[in-house]
């Protein structure tokens, strides 16, 4: 569970981008965050793993499976590193290494599990290779394992990025505009991948997305932000014209 209690974020220039955010996100939800550019969507997501510090309030994270509890605002050092290992982070950039194979790119998620000379030389244990291959298999990408990343389409590269995130074995995935650069067919495929991972693996997914139609189609819950405030928080079927007006204005 993720809990936001009276969270505010003010930039050094005085602009307030998050205003009194009170929110609970439960394990197994697929949450789409929508709103205009500058509404605070990216800032909200990046407070979860403390890429962005908050100005006031608190963020609490409980991982039921491991019985671990984090008060994000007070988490730092090795404990913050441990928290971030449990949270997969994706963006619209694929962040693949162009001249490396798909498998090598996915294996990068396992670097933190390596020690000593293996970490220095980039050697991976058989267990890590199996985790990476299993992640590719879940996305039907095994046939691409030994193909260089720069030979793939944009949609395929984003799916490789998702496979890499899966290989991290996260409890939570936060994705910032993961389909904004994709055509409608590929965007649907990537969203379908998120949905399958959410349902089959029980991984909580929070996606910042501009495509309202995709949010309604794939999310179990939609949160609408307007000028840093939550103005809508409900199931997709309740996202009617009145709700859209609250989120996007006239």
Swiss-Prot record:
Signal peptide annotation: none
A GO term from the CC aspect: plasma membrane
Reactions the enzyme catalyzes: phosphonate(out) + ATP + H2O = phosphonate(in) + ADP + phosphate + H(+)
Subcellular localization, as worded in the UniProt entry: Cell membrane
Gene3D superfamilies in the record: P-loop containing nucleotide triphosphate hydrolases (3.40.50.300)
EC assignment: 7.3.2.2
A Pfam family recorded for this sequence: ABC_tran
Keywords of the record: ATP-binding, Cell membrane, Membrane, Nucleotide-binding, Phosphonate transport, Translocase, Transport
Membrane topology (UniProt): Peripheral membrane protein
Annotated positions binding ATP: 35-42
Keyword Ion transport: no
Domain ABC transporter, residue spans: 2-247
Major location (coarse): membrane
Domain of life: Bacteria
Molecular function in Gene Ontology: ABC-type phosphonate transporter activity; ATP binding; ATP hydrolysis activity
The UniProt record lists the keyword NAD: no
PANTHER family: AMINO ACID IMPORT ATP-BINDING PROTEIN (PTHR43166), PHOSPHONATES IMPORT ATP-BINDING PROTEIN PHNC (PTHR43166:SF6)
Stated role: Part of the ABC transporter complex PhnCDE involved in phosphonates import. Responsible for energy coupling to the transport system.
NCBIfam families xrefs: ABC_phnC (TIGR02315)
Family listed: Belongs to the ABC transporter superfamily. Phosphonates importer (TC 3.A.1.9.1) family.
Subunit: The complex is composed of two ATP-binding proteins (PhnC), two transmembrane proteins (PhnE) and a solute-binding protein (PhnD).
Protein name: Phosphonates import ATP-binding protein PhnC
Organism: Mycoplasma mycoides subsp. mycoides SC (strain CCUG 32753 / NCTC 10114 / PG1)
